Swiss-Prot record:
One Pfam family per UniProt: HOK_GEF
InterPro entries: Hok/gef_toxin, Hok/gef_toxin_CS
Protein name, as recorded: Stable plasmid inheritance protein
Spans through the membrane: 6-26
Organism encoding this protein: Escherichia coli (strain K12)
Family per record: Belongs to the Hok/Gef family.
NCBIfam families documented for this protein: PRK09738.1
Keywords: Cell inner membrane, Cell membrane, Membrane, Plasmid, Toxin-antitoxin system, Transmembrane, Transmembrane helix
Lineage: Bacteria, Pseudomonadati, Pseudomonadota, Gammaproteobacteria, Enterobacterales
Lipid bilayer topology: Single-pass membrane protein
Function noted in UniProt: Toxic component of a type I toxin-antitoxin (TA) system. Part of the plasmid maintenance system, encodes a toxic protein that collapses the transmembrane potential and arrests respiration. When the adjacent non-translated flmB (sok) gene is disrupted FlmA no longer functions in plasmid maintenance (i.e. FlmB probably encodes an antisense antitoxin RNA). The flmA and flmB RNAs interact, and presence of flmB on a separate plasmid from one encoding flmA and flmB allows loss of the latter plasmid. Translation of FlmA may be coupled to the upstream flmC gene.
Gene name of this polypeptide: flmA
């Protein structure tokens, strides 16, 4: 089954938006995401500055 290119773009866009909305609803910030298990912790931070 081969999707047309425009359908593929829409599918990827919908998946990305769904992940962003889910992350926003379950976390207090989109700028910090942490994952912890028994032995490891992975943290991703987004740093940004205003261009003013």
């Amino acid at each position: 089954m081969k999707l047309p290119r425009s359908s593929l773009v829409w599918c990827v866009l919908i998946v990305c938006l769904t992940l962003l909305i889910f992350t926003y609803l379950t976390r207090k910030s989109l700028c910090e995401i942490r994952y912890r298990d028994g032995y490891r912790e992975v943290a991703a931070f987004m740093a940004y500055e205003s261009g003013k």
